């Protein structure tokens, strides 16, 4: 019973990873739903694999435009850490 449950959870997590892929390694797959989808068109997918659970393990090859967008994203992340604290759940939405 336990082994069949583990297999079921593993297969279900694989299905979820295919439906809701992550944008960056280490990000929860829900992050993709919350706003990363619009940035996806600027990135070239190299590999799409997921680990068990909600954490992504894939890698991306970035286009020059996406590299610039990622630099801007890092800037916003630093601003969020200064404004709300590194461990805060509150984030600043930017467009």
UniProtKB/Swiss-Prot annotation:
Keywords: Signal. It comes from the Eukaryota. Residues 1-17 form the signal peptide. Partially overlaps YFR035C. This is Putative uncharacterized protein YFR034W-A. It comes from Saccharomyces cerevisiae (strain ATCC 204508 / S288c).
């Amino acid at each position: 019973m336990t082994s069949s449950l583990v297999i079921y959870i593993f297969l279900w997590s694989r299905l979820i990873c295919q439906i809701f892929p992550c944008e960056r390694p280490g990000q929860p797959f829900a992050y993709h739903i919350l706003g990363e989808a619009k940035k996806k068109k600027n990135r070239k997918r190299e590999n799409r694999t997921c680990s068990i659970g909600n954490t992504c393990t894939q890698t991306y090859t970035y286009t020059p435009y996406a590299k610039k967008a990622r630099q801007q994203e890092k800037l916003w992340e630093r601003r969020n850490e200064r404004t709300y604290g590194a461990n805060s759940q509150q984030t600043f939405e930017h467009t």
